[in-house]
Amino acid sequence: MNVDRCWEQYYKTLKLIYLEENKETCQREIDHLVDTAIELKEKTYSNAVLDLGRQFREVCPKARIMWKTSSIAGNFYPPISISDIYSPVIANVFDQTTRLECRRQEYSLRMPLQEEPNFTGIQQHAQVSDCSLVVSLININRYKTTMPVVKQVAENLYATNLYFNGAQRRLVLVSTENIPTMQDDPTKQMSVHSANKINKILELGLLKLTSLSYHSEGSNTAIDTYRLCGWIPDISSINEFNFLKVHKAFSRGECLIAMGTGGFVPKENIFGVKLRKYHDYAVLDIDMINEVVTLRDPLISDTLLTINFDSIRKYFLQVYCNWDSSKLFMFTKDTQIFYSDKKFNPYQTLAGKPTFYLKNNSDRDEYAWVLLEFHLDKNNNTTAYLQEIPDRISTVRLGYNDNSAETGFQLIKIRLKPKQCIWYFCYSSTDKMLTFHTYSTSSDVVFVRSKMPGCDFDVTECAILPENIVPMQYPNHSETDIYYLASIDFSIEGEPGITIITDMVVCLETDDDLVNFQMFHWDDLDFNSPIYDEFYMNERMFEKKDLPLTSGERYRIVASTARPPISKGYQCAVSGINIHADYPCSYKLRESDVRYNSMMFKLPHVFTLASTGITKISLVNRNKYNKVFMRIYPQTQEDYRYNYRVISADTGEDLVKPGNNIQKLYGGIVIKEFLVSDQTNLELHLSFQDNGRVPVELKCQLYVGSVKIITLS
C-alpha cells in the first residue's frame, strides 16, 4: 500500500469535513480511512485518523468559517498546525503553488535558495520593496520566543504557521526552488540577507501571502509583525506617541517598536545615515535620560542611527508597536462576522449596521483591547472600522479619520468602569469577513454582537414600489409638486406621557434623489397639521433633530421626493434620549401605506373628473362584513371645491355622510373608515365646480383601503 497516497486521502478528508455540509459523505470517507489504517498498520497514521474522527464529531460553525476563509489569490491556507504535517503530499491537497512575480530583468534566472552563512545581521535586499517585513524580522529575532517555527517538508519545500484571517496558525507552504537569481552573478539572489535561513523562508512566505510579488506595497511593520508572531498591532501618529509610557513596556519585553517616515526627510546626512522617505526603521533602544532613540535601517545592517526625540517628532510620521498579549492580558476571545455590502451599505448612515457591546460585568475597573482584523481575500482594497455609537445614532453619518481603517487592522484600547457597557457599530466598504479579537484582564469582560435596545434606536428598510410615484403637494406649499415615496407607522411604546427627545432620518440609496419627510399625528388623516412645517429637499438624506415626541402616541411619517426617485429602496431610522430614565420606552417602526389608511387590501384607480357632471365609480363588495376607507387625490394645484357621496348600489342609501364644498388638503379628499354589510356594492359619486366658462378635466387618483377585498365593477 502506497503510504503517500494514504496520507493524501487523509488530508483530502480533513479538508472535506470542514468544507462539506453533507455529514454522510464525510462519514463514508472517514470509514474508508479507518479501513486503510487497519490495513496499513502504521501508528502515526492510525492516531491521525482517530483524531480526524474526533474533529468530525466536534466540528463547529466557527471552525468551518476559519476553513472557508482560507483561499487567497488562488492559494489555500488551512488553519492547521505544522505539527500535523506527516507527508509532503500535503502540498498536493492544499494548493499554494502560485509563484512570486519578479519584474527585475537582471534577476531572470530561477534557482534554489542559497544560504549566506557568513552574513552578519539581517538586511533588506535593495531590489525587494519590503522594508516593513525586514524590520519585523529584525525585531522578532531579538526575542527568540516570537520566531515562527519552520519545518522542512521536502527538498526545497518548507512549512510554517502565520497569523492571519482570524486564525493563529494558518499553514503556509514555502517553496525555495525558484528564487530570482542574477544572470551575471548566480551567487546573488532576491532574498533578505541573513545567515539564518529561516528569515529567508519567512520573507518568502509573507510576500506570497500579501502580494505574490517581490515588489510589495502598502504594508507596515505592525501588520507584518502580527502576521509573523501574533503580537497585537498598534499603529499611532508620532504626535500621539508617549516615549515614557512605551519605554517602560519596551524595557520589560512587552512590545516591539518600529517607526516610519513620511514624505519629508532632511536632504542632508545629519544622522550619519541619510533618512529615506516612506521607510520603516527598527527601534533598538529608547534612552529616556538623553532623550534619544537608537534605530536600524533595514537596508544597512552594520550601522545604527541615534536620533533625539525632537528630530523623531519632526521627521517621522508613524509609530508601529506590537504588544505581547500573553504579558498584558489573561483572556482572549475571537468573534467573526461576514459583512455584506449589499445588506449593510445601501444607505450611508449608521442605522442597520452590525452593532456590538463591550461590557465589564465585574465590580472593579478592567482593561480591554479590541482588535478588528479584516480577512485577506480577492479584494483587499477595503476600508473597515469599529466605532463607538453616539447617544443618537440615526443622525450620525459614516466617516472615520484614522488611517488604520484602510490597513486591515484597527485597535481600540479602553479602561472599563464597573458594569460599564459601550456600544459600537461596524462598517466595511466591501463584502468582507471580519474577526474581532478581544483581549481583557478579566473573564467578566465580554464583547457581544447584539441589536441595540429599543428606546435607543430602531430602523426599517423597504423597497420603493413604482406605483407609489404620484405627484402631491405639501401643506402651505401647494405651488410645489412633490412625489409620494413611502409612509411609516411610528409609535413610542411604554409608560404614556413620557417625553422622548427624538432624532429621525430618512435616507435613500443615491445622491441623485432629493428627499423630505413630514410627520403627522395618527388621527390627522388629511395631513393638514404637520408636527413641524419645514419644507425643503436634501440630497439622499433628510433628518430632523430634537423632536419632543410623547410615549403612548402614534404618528405617521410621510416621505417624498422632488421627482420620481432613482433609488430602489429607502431607510428610516430613529433614535433618542429618554429624559425620564425611570420609565423605559421603546420605538416601533413599521412600513404602513398611509394612502390606504394602512388597511390590508389596497385598490388603486386612476380616473378623469370633469367639471361638467358627476363621475361615478362602481365597486364590488362580496363580503357580508367589510370596513372601507377612501382617499381621492385630484392632481391639480387649483383651489377647487369638491362634492362626494358614497351610496349603496343596490338601494341608493348613503353609506357615509355626503361631503359638500370640500377643499382638497395635503392628503387629498379623505372619506374616513365606514362599515359595509350584507354584500353591499358601492358607488362613489364625485364632482367639482369650476367658475370658468371653459370645461375642465382633472386627472385623479383613488385609493381604496379595506379589511376584505373590494374590486372595480
Swiss-Prot record:
Keywords attached to this entry: Hydrolase, Protease, Thiol protease
Enzyme type, top EC level: hydrolase
Free-text function comment from the UniProt entry: Required for the proteolytic cleavage of the transcription factor RIM101 in response to alkaline ambient pH.
Catalytic residues, chain numbering: C131, H279, N308
GO aspect biological process, one term: proteolysis
InterPro entries reported for this sequence: PalB/RIM13_Calpain-like, Papain-like_cys_pep_sf
Record carries keyword Protease: yes
Gene designation: RIM13
Protein name, as recorded: Calpain-like protease palB/RIM13
The keyword Nucleotide-binding appears for this protein: no
EC number: 3.4.22.-
Family: Belongs to the peptidase C2 family. PalB/RIM13 subfamily.
Higher taxonomy: Eukaryota, Fungi, Dikarya, Ascomycota, Saccharomycotina
Record-annotated Calpain catalytic domain positions: 74-325
PANTHER family documented for this protein: CALPAIN-7
Record-level Gene Ontology MF annotations: cysteine-type endopeptidase activity
Source taxon at top rank: Eukaryota
